[in-house]
């Protein structure tokens, strides 16, 4: 099977195409546990995340020793270790790209920053939570308004291999809507009081408990 055939058959989940490109690449590695390969992808971006945090901190913190400490502390954060290296989740990918984009903006590299934001958006919709930071950056003249068009442009560019593999533009534009329809819960597996309530609890029973 060539790469194009692989893309056409492999991209069929509710993950966004860019993440599936990475999974397709590691699927070529033979005789190695796939769980470790998936986690290796996240761990690679953990390094990028730590570097981005170090660069951002370096705007205020002086001294190579302090930067090394910041780099290593970032890698040892429980949220980083558990989400990536332990669970093999891909949240670190969009987070590292967003923080790198923020650093680029603060360096007044507006175009690069917006491209990175677009790339992050192609991995996870949660990137939108970083976008309000663009307003103060624009007011500070760190980014240029005309460069905002690079965000959707970068997003669509990240979808090109999926188009080549047979996916439609409609799929690229509606993948997040599909996810929203699949996971139609306010909270899923999150540490909250809702975990103490059984799924499908009768409303009258619920009212009785809290009345």
PLM region spans:
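Primarily membrane-embedded glycan-assembly and transfer machineries that use lipid-linked glycans
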Residues: 1-107, 138-211
């Amino acid at each position: 099977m060539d790469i194009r055939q692989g893309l056409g058959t492999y991209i069929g989940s509710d993950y966004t195409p860019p993440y599936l490109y990475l999974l397709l690449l590691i699927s070529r590695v033979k005789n190695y546990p796939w769980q470790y390969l998936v986690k290796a992808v996240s761990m690679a971006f953990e390094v990028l995340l730590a570097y981005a945090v170090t660069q951002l901190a370096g705007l205020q913190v002086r001294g190579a020793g302090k930067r090394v400490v910041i780099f290593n502390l970032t890698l040892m954060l429980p949220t980083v270790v558990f989400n990536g290296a332990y669970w093999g989740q891909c949240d670190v990918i969009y987070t590292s790209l967003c923080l790198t984009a923020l650093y680029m903006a603060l360096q007044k590299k507006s175009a690069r920053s917006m491209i990175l934001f677009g790339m992050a958006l192609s991995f996870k919709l949660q990137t939108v939570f970083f976008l309000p930071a663009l307003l103060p950056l624009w007011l500070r003249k760190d980014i240029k308004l005309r460069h905002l068009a690079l965000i959707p442009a970068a997003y669509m560019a990240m979808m090109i291999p999926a188009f080549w593999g047979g996916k439609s533009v409609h799929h690229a534009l509606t993948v997040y809507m599909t996810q929203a329809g699949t996971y139609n819960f306010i909270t899923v597996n999150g540490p909250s009081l809702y975990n103490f309530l059984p799924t499908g609890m009768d409303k009258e029973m619920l009212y009785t408990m809290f009345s």
